[in-house]
Amino acid sequence: MPEEALLTIVVKAALVVFIVITAFAYLLLWERKLIGRFQVRYGPNRVGPLGYLQPLADVVKLVFKEDAVPAGANRILFSLAPLISIAAAVGAIALVPFGDPTTYLGHQVNFFGADLDISLLVLFALSGLGFYGLILGGWASGNKYSLLGSARTAAQLVSYEVAMGLSAVGVVMAAGSLSLVDIVQAQADFTWYVLVQPVGFVVFMIAAVAETNRAPFDLPEAESELVAGYHTEYSGLKFSMFFLAEYVNMIVISGVGATLFLGGYSGPGLPGWLWLAIKVTVLLFLFIWLRATLPRLRYDRLMKFGWKVLLPVATANLLVTAVVVGLAFER
């Protein structure tokens, strides 16, 4: 491999890690401040100017906390589980396109990790792989509450992943490609797929909230029932990895939603990466708004909603899309 190509890969990897860590830190701060506003109180405002050094204080606190391993735990899998979760989340974000290719010092620079013909499929595979970390973490802890949290995670993943996939297939049919770059380019003239696939967008976002274990679908870690769910026995840096993976998954799934339905990085006047950041921020605000507004569902209702409401709606939307695309193709 040429040295320039290797250097490009290293720089891209370092940039992705920097973006992920920075976005996580200030997304967490933004969430705490927003929820404070929703509840008519102040959020973090003591550490640094207006509280903007609070993420740094949280990191220092977690670094110095004891990293305990339960006596009955499988030590190898217990340590490996958070690494699987964070690696899958960071790997997935590298597939989201941030902008059109540009030229720098005579070389083409792409604003994405890899433009694969099946990048959407690979991204879903990586996202699903991250849940094995949650399942392994709960099982390896040797704790009944952790195991129940893992079982709930597996059931919730199976229940909502199908509906999310079906909602994405409608976009793939309309764009005629599984490449995220091609899907963005198909919406470049402001024919955003949220306008032609509104039902698919709603299904995708509901499933996205469930896939990231966010309220009101945060049953795998319901503190009133399971202490803390799959990460009950985790502390210190291992706990922070699970925490980081959850928020990175929120960013990834918001990036995918913006790419599939809101035109991704396309838009007039502003740089592509800034357009994508604006759209992702809007979708992240929806995550936080739902957390501050809606109560947690009962577990049986969560399952019934996934199988008896969301999946039939996603299937009907896909069938209608297939008919419309087929008729348009014949013409």
What is each PLM-predicted segment?
Residues 1-331:
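Selective transmembrane helix interface/packing segments
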